Regions:
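Conserved S-adenosyl-L-methionine
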Residues: 2-109, 117, 128-130, 145, 187-196, ...
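Conserved catalytic core of Hanks-type protein kinase domains
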Residues: 153, 181-182
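Glycine-rich S-adenosyl-L-methionine
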Residues: 130-154
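Short, flexible active-site loops
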Residues: 131-134, 160-167, 193
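Short glycine-dipeptide loop
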Residues: 154-160
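Conserved ATPase-coupling elements of RecA-like P-loop NTPase cores
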Residues: 119-124
Length: 196
């Protein structure tokens, strides 16, 4: 699956001089590594690829950083965070002046394989810019919360690939409203169903 996702993203980004890639549920970093390898075939300078990773579990967060460096990626091209993606969005700010230097992270490609149908706390998230436009995923299933987080962090010409359970295509309620809104706003290009 990661090879297919990587090739689709690399094809979309092939003419860009500088590329930012983000995995908000990076695990060991394998998706970032595969995408970076595919994108590197199309760029003149591999050092123009910047990798952003966020991971909840500290041990796998450390694996992400280690695996990227072991693949020859310069530490200066790796920005990794140990945090909860749905609770702690990734703004950029300078530590000594967070209020005046705040800006959200926008990237050329987002790739993720978030935990399936995980419960999440949507309390006080109605005005969160990641969800305000399309709605809140149900508290019992965070699949669309992850998807909307990913979508929010894309540049206007960016591309996203996310692995989700088939249920996101058929479930009703708030998920149906989010799905309909995404389709009506032309935010879904392709869905690839794979056997279990």
């Amino acid at each position: 699956v990661s090879v297919l996702m990587s090739e689709i993203i690399a094809h979309h980004l092939k003419d860009q001089a500088e590329i930012k890639i983000y995995d908000p549920t990076s695990g060991s970093g394998s998706l970032l590594i595969n995408i970076g390898t595919s994108v590197a075939k199309h760029v003149k300078d591999n050092n123009k690829i910047k990798y952003y990773a966020q991971e909840l579990k500290e041990n796998t967060y450390n694996l992400t950083r280690m695996n990227l460096v072991m693949r020859g990626i310069l530490p200066s091209n790796i920005v990794a965070r140990n945090a909860d993606t749905l609770e702690d969005d990734w703004p950029y700010f300078e530590e000594n002046d967070p209020i005046n230097t705040y800006e959200p992270l926008y990237v050329d490609a987002v790739v993720s394989n978030p935990p399936y149908s995980q419960a999440w706390d949507s309390k006080n998230k109605e005005s969160d810019p990641r969800y305000a436009r399309f709605g809140l995923a149900p508290t019992t299933k965070a699949d669309y919360a992850f998807l909307l987080h990913d979508l929010y962090h894309l540049t206007p010409d960016g591309i996203m690939a996310i692995v989700l359970p088939h249920g996101v295509l058929f479930r009703g309620g708030e998920e149906e409203r989010i799905r309909k809104n995404l389709i009506e706003n032309n935010h879904i290009d392709t869905i690839i169903g794979l056997p279990a």
